[in-house]
Structures are given as structure tokens and as C-alpha cells.
Design a protein with these regions (language model features):
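Internal mixed beta-strand/loop scaffold within catalytic domains of large alpha/beta enzymes
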Residues: 1-21
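CBM-like, beta-strand-rich accessory domains located in the C-terminal region of large
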Residues: 21-189
Length: 189
């Protein structure tokens, strides 16, 4: 999660409406607890799997850096490495994902969930008072609006962004910079 100037930029949608199905094996069919409600990659069409055994493991955690091994969160035997690295600075957060595969052609979709509606710009996306910069020529960008029933039967809307890339080599790295500019509270909701 990333909050800037009162805006939730990168978000976790929280819990959905509690129903009997929400507490059954159908739980992950609902948007809020599903992998698609979280800012995690989709690898070869496979989302992060559900269950305790499918999770990331922290490799390094310091005041300025966090590295997570995410390979075990995916049920894809061609995926040999997936590490997610966060670097924290005063005015930006840098996110690097490193992928390694058995095969040469793979599909990587960097998936993000935002509270504020993003717009495409020259260097990537503008989200409220934050710019998410990346190499736009590497990705096909798709912005979606998702409305779901949240707690107490209220409708809530978030925006998902899928940045799709067909990887033609066995290794691939992505880099996203969240450049933070605190101007004023966004009205883009």
C-alpha cells in the first residue's frame, strides 16, 4: 500500500461483503480476497495461488530496502525465479521484479490496484499526486474499473492496471518508479 497526500495510491481493497460463500471454498472467487485484488504479477496467465504454502519469503529487510522471493507463490514449473525488490527514498519508491524461466517465451503481466483512477502519461501512469514511471514501450497497458460489494453491502470502486509483456528471453527484469509529488489532495476518485 502507498498513501500520498491523503490519497491511497496503491491499495488493498480490504474485505468484501461477508456472505456464507465468503467463508467457504468459494472465498477466492470474490474480488477482495483474490490475487487480482492485490498488486502482484500474473505469470504465464497464473495468478498468485491461494493457501499458506503459496507465499513470498523475505530475503532481506532494512530501513531502505525489502527483497521478497515470490517464486513459491505461483504454481508454474517454468518459473525458476521471481524476486521483488523495493527501494525506499524520500521522494520515490522503486520496485524491481526479476523473473527467470526454463523457456524463452513467457507472458508477464505486472498487475497493480489503485484507489485513484490512473491516466496514461509519457513516462507511464499518473495516479493522483504520484507518477509511476516505467519503460512504456515494453508493456501493453490496460486500465480497468472494478466495482464490488464491500463490507456492509456498500459498493466500492478500485482501478486495476495490467501491464503485459511477452518475454522472449529466459530472464527479464522490470522497474517501476513511484515518484511522489505532494501537491494537493486528488479529486480523481
Amino acid at each position: 500500500m502507498l498513501n500520498v497526500g491523503g490519497d491511497k495510491i496503491v491499495t488493498d481493497p480490504g474485505r468484501g461483503e461477508y456472505t456464507s460463500d465468503y467463508f467457504s471454498s468459494k472465498r477466492y472467487k470474490y474480488f477482495p480476497p483474490s490475487a487480482l485484488a492485490h498488486s502482484v504479477p500474473v505469470v504465464n496467465g497464473i495468478v498468485q495461488q491461494e493457501g499458506e504454502e503459496y507465499r513470498g519469503n523475505i530475503i532481506k529487510a532494512t530501513e531502505n530496502e525489502l527483497i521478497i522471493d515470490c517464486k513459491d507463490a505461483y504454481n508454474d514449473c517454468s518459473l525458476k525465479e521471481l524476486t521483488r525488490k523495493f527501494e525506499f527514498y524520500d521522494d520515490k519508491i522503486v520496485l524491481n521484479d526479476k523473473f527467470a524461466f526454463d523457456t524463452d517465451k513467457n507472458d508477464v503481466t505486472e498487475h497493480f490496484v489503485f484507489d485513484v483512477k490512473p491516466t496514461e502519461c509519457e513516462n507511464g501512469l499518473k495516479i493522483g499526486n504520484t507518477e509511476m514511471c516505467y519503460n512504456v514501450s515494453d508493456f501493453e497497458c490496460k486500465i480497468n474499473e472494478v466495482t464490488y460489494a464491500s463490507n456492509y453491502n456498500k459498493q466500492k470502486t478500485v482501478y486495476t492496471v495490467d501491464l503485459k509483456h511477452i518475454v522472449k528471453t529466459k530472464t527479464f527484469e522490470t522497474k517501476f518508479e513511484f515518484n511522489i509529488k505532494i501537491l494537493e489532495r486528488s479529486e480523481n476518485k
